[in-house]
Each structure stands twice: as structure tokens, then as C-alpha cells.
């Protein structure tokens, strides 16, 4: 197969409807729009969500909940992900980002959680650490520093 031999699959290209090209075409005069009315006009139609004057769904349903602007948001990392680092490595949010362990640092920083096992002795400097993670890090001789 060569580049010039490529062509669309059968039925993939549909000819556009040619309207307003004479009565004998079958799509002349009103160009398939019918007579007068909102839909016959240029720019005609209703805005999205308009239900003809009936109270729209978005206004019939009650409002619920809110966004708490004071909510703490952390990027979570389990101790099993820290197993890839060498002994005595200082683990910081920047290092985790650089090594691809996390894809971004959330506004309140990084929190280390306790899922998985850890055998390496690490120095972990992050914004928050769960109790289980702290025990696992310290059990293998590592240190936890909350920054």
C-alpha cells in the first residue's frame, strides 16, 4: 500500500445536500425549511436548554451542595511507591514529581499513606503523613519530617 492509494472507506464520504438550486431539484424555493416560522429564518432556533416557555429542567431541580474553599487537597502517595528509591534518599515532593511518582503537587502538598510494604531506609520530608505510613517508615529505620 502506498500513500497515493489511500482512500476513504465506502460510504464514509456523504455528499452534502444542495439546497436552493431550483424547483426541479426537490430542494428549491424554501430549501427544505418549510414556510415561515422560527426554524425557517437565518439564525433561527432556540437556545440550548429552552423548553418553549415551560420551566426548564435546570430551574425545576433544586440546588445542592457547595465547594468548600477551605478544603485541604493533598497529592496522595503510598509507601509502596517509595520502594523504588535507594537507602538514605531524602524524599521531597519535588523529587517525587521529577521521578514521575506523582503527576502534580496539589495546593496543600503531598501526603504519604500506608498501603504496601517498605524495606528501604528513607528520609521523608512531606506536608502530611498518615499514622500507618509513619510507623512503616520508622520501623525500617527511616525518618519522617513534616514540612
UniProtKB/Swiss-Prot annotation:
GO biological process terms, semicolon-separated: translation
GO molecular function: rRNA binding; structural constituent of ribosome
Key word Amino-acid biosynthesis present: no
GO CC list: cytosolic large ribosomal subunit
Stretches for region Disordered: 1-58
Family annotation (InterPro entries): Ribosomal_uL15, Ribosomal_uL15/eL18, Ribosomal_uL15/eL18_sf, Ribosomal_uL15_bac-type, Ribosomal_uL15_CS
Pfam families for the chain: Ribosomal_L27A (PF00828)
Domain of life: Bacteria
Biased composition (Gly residues): 42-52
Keywords: Ribonucleoprotein, Ribosomal protein, RNA-binding, rRNA-binding
Subunit-level organization: Part of the 50S ribosomal subunit.
Function: Binds to the 23S rRNA.
HAMAP family documented for this protein: Ribosomal_uL15
NCBIfam families in alphabetical order: rplO_bact (TIGR01071)
Entry similarity comment: Belongs to the universal ribosomal protein uL15 family.
Name assigned to this protein: Large ribosomal subunit protein uL15
Primary gene name: rplO
Amino acid at each position: 500500500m502506498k500513500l497515493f492509494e489511500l482512500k476513504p472507506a465506502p460510504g464514509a464520504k456523504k455528499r452534502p445536500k444542495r439546497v436552493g438550486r431550483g424547483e426541479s431539484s426537490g430542494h428549491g424555493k424554501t430549501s427544505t425549511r418549510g414556510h415561515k416560522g422560527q426554524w425557517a429564518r437565518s439564525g433561527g432556533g432556540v437556545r440550548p436548554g429552552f423548553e418553549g416557555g415551560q420551566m426548564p429542567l435546570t430551574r425545576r431541580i433544586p440546588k445542592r451542595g457547595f465547594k468548600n474553599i477551605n478544603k485541604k487537597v493533598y497529592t496522595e502517595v503510598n509507601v509502596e511507591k517509595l520502594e523504588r528509591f535507594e537507602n538514605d534518599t531524602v524524599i521531597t515532593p519535588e523529587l517525587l514529581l521529577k521521578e514521575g511518582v506523582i503527576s502534580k503537587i496539589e495546593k496543600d502538598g503531598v501526603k504519604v499513606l500506608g498501603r504496601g510494604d517498605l524495606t528501604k531506609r528513607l528520609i521523608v520530608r512531606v506536608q502530611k503523613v498518615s499514622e500507618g505510613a509513619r510507623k512503616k517508615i520508622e520501623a525500617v529505620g527511616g525518618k519522617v519530617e513534616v514540612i
